[in-house]
Amino acid sequence: MSTAGKVIKCKAAVLWEEKKPFSIEEVEVAPPKAHEVRIKMVATGICRSDDHVVSGTLVTPLPVIAGHEAAGIVESIGEGVTTVRPGDKVIPLFTPQCGKCRVCKHPEGNFCLKNDLSMPRGTMQDGTSRFTCRGKPIHHFLGTSTFSQYTVVDEISVAKIDAASPLEKVCLIGCGFSTGYGSAVKVAKVTQGSTCAVFGLGGVGLSVIMGCKAAGAARIIGVDINKDKFAKAKEVGATECVNPQDYKKPIQEVLTEMSNGGVDFSFEVIGRLDTMVTALSCCQEAYGVSVIVGVPPDSQNLSMNPMLLLSGRTWKGAIFGGFKSKDSVPKLVADFMAKKFALDPLITHVLPFEKINEGFDLLRSGESIRTILTF
């Protein structure tokens, strides 16, 4: 029996208030309106940004159905939808691509003006919600809301992918992998034979390493205070790893000496102000490039010496690895299918969706790289 055009009752993880566990609830998911798509979720990853919603460091309207790194199958479409059809495998896009705004029209820009990250409304593009629970409307998150058996997204926030792709793996292309990989290949534009330093060896940091390796870097130095992360970093391409706690002098001095005067490219994948300045400082003063990859949106201002830039360094950042989402996600999935990179090293745990709170405990304890929830 077709569910198209009907309200679907299903399970979702609702966050009713900050700093509380997710509550598995029965929710009602309205059918898609014009230019909207309803998706049956198959797999979703647990990303640090979702935990920032729980902790309150990423402020978004509550109650909310969070989740933004996922893959699923189109259940039904609203009128006027042309880029996907029912049965298509898809990845929701937390950074939309409307194709019409000045950012989408700019060759380098990818932070579409229709995003819900700059000033979160927690709604669809038309300002309303498709979720109801206990008679109350529930907010959307970044236009995706993947912690639900069904979700509704705008057409500008979904990409059709290869019908043969394993959704429980390629869901990582919806955020973590692409954010790291793109920071190396697209934002920094890492060059053949270069030396790179990557601060923070979580899932996104490992993806940065994969990007540096794919771009042909000769040396990739992983930096983390948890030496348990070094083996995995080397498995995906790090040539050496250093622990700042093993040295009496500041780690930027250690890295500058190791690289004969500074690395070509550095990446801060932690979201700490002190390590951002450290990463900038350790890159070569005349032509080094440092990229800020991870940062909680409530971060404080930092102080730095502008002479670090005056000598010739470049300091930059990007959302979603600088990729234009709707254009790039299908290509990244095709590259994965062509074995140009692996996603298995990033996945440490797979849990049923109902165990979402366990998955977040694994993230907070540092035990997991990526936990995938399956529906």
Curated annotation (Swiss-Prot):
Cofactor stoichiometry and binding remark: Binds 2 Zn(2+) ions per subunit.
GO BP, one example? retinoic acid metabolic process
List where in the cell it is found.
Cytoplasm
Gene3D superfamilies in the record, alphabetically?
Medium-chain alcohol dehydrogenases, catalytic domain, NAD(P)-binding Rossmann-like Domain
Q: What does the entry list as the binding residues for NAD(+)?
A: S49, G200, L201, G202, G203, V204, G205, D224, K229, V293, G294, V295, F320, R370
Predominant cellular place of this UniProt entry's protein: cytoplasm
Which residues are Zn(2+) 2-binding? Answer: C98, C101, C104, C112
User: Sorted alphabetically, which keywords does the UniProt record give?
Assistant: Acetylation, Cytoplasm, Metal-binding, NAD, Oxidoreductase, Zinc
Q: What class of enzyme is it?
A: oxidoreductase
Q: Which residues bind Zn(2+) 1?
A: C47, S49, H68, C175
Specify whether NAD is a keyword of the entry. Answer: yes
Q: Which reaction does it catalyse?
A: a primary alcohol + NAD(+) = an aldehyde + NADH + H(+); a secondary alcohol + NAD(+) = a ketone + NADH + H(+)
- Quick one: which residues bind an alcohol? S49, H68
State the oligomer form and interacting partners: Dimer of identical or non-identical chains of two types (E and S) coded by 2 separate genes at different loci.
Q: Which family does it belong to?
A: Belongs to the zinc-containing alcohol dehydrogenase family. Class-I subfamily.
Protein name, entry field: Alcohol dehydrogenase E chain
Q: What organism is the protein native to?
A: Equus caballus (Horse)
